[in-house]
Amino acid sequence: MKYHDLRDFLALLEKQGELKRITLPVDPYLEMTEIADRTLRAGGPALLFENPKGYSMPVLCNLFGTPKRVAMGMGQEDVSALREVGKLLAFLKEPEPPKGFRDLFDKLPQFKQVLNMPTKRLRGAPCQQKILEGDAVDLTRIPIMQCWPEDAAPLITWGLTVTRGPHKERQNLGIYRQQLIGKNKLIMRWLSHRGGALDFQEWCAAHPGERFPVSVALGADPATILGAVTPVPDTLSEYAFAGLLRGTKTEVVKCISNDLEVPASAEIVLEGYIEQGDMAPEGPYGDHTGYYNEIDNFPVFTVTHITQRDDAIYHSTYTGRPPDEPAVLGVALNEVFVPILQKQFPEIVDFYLPPEGCSYRLAVVTIKKQYAGHAKRVMMGVWSFLRQFMYTKFVIVCDDDVNARDWNDVIWAITTRMDPARDTVLVENTPIDYLDFASPVSGLGSKMGLDATNKWPGETSREWGRPIQKDPEVTARIDAIWDELAILNDGKPESDR
């Protein structure tokens, strides 16, 4: 499913009945959130608010409101095909030379996709059709949503932040929320371990007192946005990965005021800088946990230039207690994670991040257990292998006879195969999401692993329970007379209804 930019993608959605245009005036203050929330919970379409109250710029919401649309954004027809994206990423993380002619033939599609990795640099681009600078820069003219009643101010949610550390060729792309505090100022809420924050720290060390260049793309194409939230190998840029997903090279253009490269077809680009030491209190905001988070200090992003397309569209979302758009993204990206984990840990059968667990705070893993202590090794692997699971507080490991996506199965395994003292692993003083107010210290807390597997010799000295199995011959005999019994059919055999 190929597309060029966000507008091209919206046209595809509209053809499939996946986009609804809202012509009635709707207020970005709370009203858009209410409509988007109801629509998402009903599995409804993406929403294009064409007449935001008080603004002339349309607002796009709920773009990734269903797993199907996430898959479409990644160039796939359905969610099941995302496993192929995961296999490609697993291959790129640890590429292996072909083992023979047949293996070479099997890997040709992967090698062909790699041809779309290099970016294409343009001299002029749609995102620079209009250029605003100086006093003309006014962020309040953008219909930035305020999502919840006690939010501190309007909040940019889908800003694709572009940074580059000193002496680095590769740029970093990250999604960081940004609080509006003035006509040309935003607060950049990036956590200390994120790529943008690390680039800034390195810049401050290498260039004391100098301004740090930053650009933010709003309304980039879906593949580029999704590339910024996917476990891309460190050797692969997000732009290159977006090209793989889209099937065409990512087009970029150099910014007007700095050397950063942004998506050429983005709807809006904010260019500016962060002054070292310029901090401001951010929040509170309702977030994906379903609570308002605490106030904390983060760097101030000063916007010097706004470039945009003619008739630009502002792309936004809201976050709240699941289900919300990040939770839906988590459900879809779960399918990408599975092959990557299986490449490193072949014993993993399935991996599931329940959306009600805020998408990443709890994981259920099923394995083909091979030795005593195996479950604990897998726990440690999940916590350490991908940085996306750095904040996963709970890891439950079960045998492969358990369906990781069925709570009835998982709870049965926990309550029948676990001894709390023996089979619970607690790890203290580990990195924790700064939004997790339950941790004793901001950004630092504990993790729990639950070994809900059958226990092997060395893990127990007792005779282990044997699962009850039905007699297949009896089951077959009852299957043959079940309709005639008419137990669940209002007393009438199937043939008489």
Swiss-Prot record:
Reactions accelerated catalytically: a 4-hydroxy-3-(all-trans-polyprenyl)benzoate + H(+) = a 2-(all-trans-polyprenyl)phenol + CO2
Cofactor names: prenylated FMN; Mn(2+)
EC number from the UniProt entry: 4.1.1.98
Pathway(s) it belongs to: Cofactor biosynthesis; ubiquinone biosynthesis
Free-text cofactor note: Binds 1 prenylated FMN per subunit.
Bilayer topology annotation: Peripheral membrane protein
InterPro entries: UbiD, UbiD-like_C, UbiD-like_N, UbiD_bacteria, UbiD_Rift_dom
Residues binding prenylated FMN: 175-177, 189-191, 194-195
Transmembrane segments: none
Alphabetized UniProt keyword annotations: Cell membrane, Decarboxylase, Flavoprotein, FMN, Lyase, Manganese, Membrane, Metal-binding, Ubiquinone biosynthesis
NADP recorded as keyword: no
GO MF annotation list: 3-octaprenyl-4-hydroxybenzoate carboxy-lyase activity; metal ion binding
One Pfam family it belongs to: UbiD
Keyword Transmembrane set for record: no
Residues where Mn(2+) binds: 172, 238
Gene Ontology CC terms, in alphabetical order: cytosol; plasma membrane
SUPFAM superfamilies linked: FMN-binding split barrel, UbiD C-terminal domain-like
Record: active site: 287 (proton donor)
GO biological process: ubiquinone biosynthetic process
Primary role: Catalyzes the decarboxylation of 3-octaprenyl-4-hydroxy benzoate to 2-octaprenylphenol, an intermediate step in ubiquinone biosynthesis.
Name of this chain's protein: 3-octaprenyl-4-hydroxybenzoate carboxy-lyase
Source organism: Enterobacter sp. (strain 638)
